């Protein structure tokens, strides 16, 4: 079955697409990455940077996660990301999203050995 690290990659990594995504991008990617199976995931962030650069965040600044855990890390540089948010008219199975292209610091949770990203916490 899928590991937490693999799930992070499926849900959040899109290294090779340009960061100039639109709502069409979100609608396709949310479906392609299986986040509209059984329900519409309300919000999801895709990161347009190399996996290596995102994994490196695990050794950058430690911050507290939203849930109070202490294994979150904030990227030292800003990263190109796309926020996909469900629109008001979205209704399963016709999930609909709007895209925001942003350049922000990401905050991710890391765990394991090797110490790798397992959860996207926030962007700041």
Curated annotation (Swiss-Prot):
Tissue specificity comment: Pancreas.
GO MF annotations, alphabetized: lyase activity; nucleic acid binding; ribonuclease A activity
Stretches the record annotates as Disordered: 1-23
UniProt keyword annotation of Disulfide bond present: yes
UniProt xrefs under Pfam families: RnaseA (PF00074)
Intrachain disulfide bonds: 26-84, 40-95, 58-110, 65-72
Entry-linked Gene3D superfamilies: Ribonuclease A-like domain (3.10.130.10)
Keyword terms, alphabetized: Disulfide bond, Endonuclease, Hydrolase, Lyase, Nuclease, Secreted
Catalytic residues identified in the record: 12, 119
Enzyme class: lyase
Subcellular location: Secreted
Catalytic activity: an [RNA] containing cytidine + H2O = an [RNA]-3'-cytidine-3'-phosphate + a 5'-hydroxy-ribonucleotide-3'-[RNA]; an [RNA] containing uridine + H2O = an [RNA]-3'-uridine-3'-phosphate + a 5'-hydroxy-ribonucleotide-3'-[RNA]
Main location: secreted
Protein family (similarity comment): Belongs to the pancreatic ribonuclease family.
Name this polypeptide is given: Ribonuclease pancreatic
Organism for this UniProt entry: Camelus dromedarius
Gene: RNASE1
